[in-house]
Amino acid sequence: MSFSNREQGHAKERLLPTAKDIDALVRAEHHDPFSILGPHGDGAGGQFIRAYLPGALSVSVVDKNSGEELGPLEATETPGLFVGHFEGSRPYLLRTRWAGGEQVAEDPYSFGQLLGEMDLYLFAEGNHRDLSSCLGAQLKTVDGVDGVRFAVWAPNARRVSVVGDFNVWDGRRHPMRLRHPSGVWELFIPRLQAGELYKYEILGAHGILPLKADPMALATSLPPDTASKVASPLQIDWQDQDWMSGRRERQQHNAPLSIYELHAGSWQCELDDLGEVARQYTWPELAERLIPYVKELGFTHIELMPIMEHPFGGSWGYQLLSQFAPSARYGTPEQFGEFVNACHQAGIGVILDWVPAHFPTDTHGLAQFDGTALYEYGNPLEGFHQDWDTLIYNLGRTEVHGYMLASALHWLKHFHIDGLRVDAVASMLYRDYSRKAGEWVPNRHGGRENLEAIDFLRHLNDVVALEAPGALVIAEESTAWPGVSQSTQQGGLGFAYKWNMGWMHDSLHYIQQDPVYRAHHHNELSFGLVYAWSERFILPISHDEVVHGKHSLIDKMPGDRWQKFANLRAYLSFMWTHPGKKLLFMGCEFGQWREWNHDQQLDWYLLQYSEHKGVQKLVSDLNRLYREEPALHEQDDAPQGFQWLIGDDAINSVYAWLRWSKDGTPVLVVANFTPVPRQSYRVGVPFAGRWKELLNSDADTYAGSNYGNGGGAFTEEVASHGQALSLELNLPPLAVLILKPEV
């Protein structure tokens, strides 16, 4: 193969692109760079080679197999455009000389189409289950060459380029190929490696857009930087086979589920000499500290507030832009995977908060991604969320539907996540959510329901059940939408659980009343049992209840210091014995006084005080009882698992009920929500003999007054509360007793 710098009979106009093509190339407006760059046959067995490398001093062609230099490409009148004609057609390298050195690599424009037709078809259909291995930046070997395959969806763009340090962020250097009709742009850049930072430069209908981060990025730079990062394939030595194989049974509805909700960046932090936060812990550091703590307290699961990358820390992760990348704040994707691995080996499940409802308007993100409303609705009456100043995903678009579905599966399958708590479901279900008349667009039937979001949620739950057996999908849903946790086959949304926001609001409103007024609010604490079996519920005391002036959980409690702690212990005991799975936000388990602040760690120093240590001990004992006593968890979603004994003693603010296991073993719960000890208070029970006191929230081990029944009581043949037998109990002030018949 020899270089022909006089074209040897080939017309010079065939060597050069047309003036129109050159102009579009220089202006970075060419929609099809592969049509003019790279190798092109001359019809006689030879090839034209063209390269556009603005800033290059010279370019020559090297035989890839022999290393022989075949000759230079001619510099043209257009700076940066180099052309040449070669006889024969063999693989080649480009040797490019820059002001700062020399580079030898394959020509990105010498490679054929990259993505398979089936991948593109499934993506367009919204049904690609492993999109995180298809789009985005993927380390690949193409035609024996290692490098990175970039692929991004931008169907309305006129041109898309990959930019990064590797091309000095010059959008003219690596324009991409459009794959019709999917709207996906692709390019393979040889010899690029993991760790490279990159973005996309997109030319929209009205000009160049702000540089965009990759919607499919698997890793990111550390905020406030906003670049995406080329990630290596996950290399995690999974040692959680026992956990994963037993997960379906462990997460059945009749199993205990006690969730510790936390914010990874503010649970514990490294402090400086002044006690201020010096830095947030990484996943390995958190694993070392958090896992033993959660294990000791007896929670079955942790729930992490969103750990996907988000630009603004003050959003707590709920305004995220990287649906596939763990935040760089806490380490690498591999470190997060190892954190999950360690949790599973310790017998702790991991649930992630996941946000498919909305996304922030940051210009480097999804907003107007290709110059049009691509991921969001175009009409602000549909696409703008007034409460949060965010944009709403257009889940009616198949590609967006599939994008969010793939995100869910990415966490569940690649990171072995045990469940997703879907944020803000109510805002997804209703088109008029938080909107006044005239501020929303009805659905195609004229109604207020968001039919696209409903279809998405049902599809999500069906797909998760198929692709990640045993994984939980939990709805934070605050309205009375029917059938949230009913199967899709029965017309429901198909969630495993729904947060019981009604119970949370009513019970907190009750417990904040001065005990002297609680008689007038007696039904607030019992009303939850009217609808307790309409859904499968989780009882949530979440981060939302301890911020924005709502006070911490203990600071909501009325009375002096002693009464506040007694009320808190009674409330937690009530919660743990009430039908429904449990969720408690970090800090509540030891009675942190101040509201949660995402910029500070929890007030761990409080544990030097007996009252705080007592609350922590109580939570540990409640979790142990909850796990050990089938009556407290087996029939959470069945009316036969609960029986009122006393629900109408408003004057004394006393409640009593039985929880039943499937084999007919009861647990008795008696609650006194006044500071007045009740001596010889009679409670009807179904079985004769001694009833053992399993827990007294007023015990001295919890820093209570230790008023009680000496560890148990014997029944008397005195009928009471519809039972032939009864117990005469001493009810401690602001406390809950849990008893069980001795066998």
Swiss-Prot record:
Belongs to the glycosyl hydrolase 13 family. GlgB subfamily. Catalyzes the formation of the alpha-1,6-glucosidic linkages in glycogen by scission of a 1,4-alpha-linked oligosaccharide from growing alpha-1,4-glucan chains and the subsequent attachment of the oligosaccharide to the alpha-1,6 position. One of its GO terms (cellular component) is cytosol. GO terms for biological process: glycogen biosynthetic process. Keywords: Carbohydrate metabolism, Glycogen biosynthesis, Glycogen metabolism, Glycosyltransferase, Transferase. This is 1,4-alpha-glucan branching enzyme GlgB. SMART domains: Aamy (SM00642). PANTHER family: 1,4-ALPHA-GLUCAN-BRANCHING ENZYME.
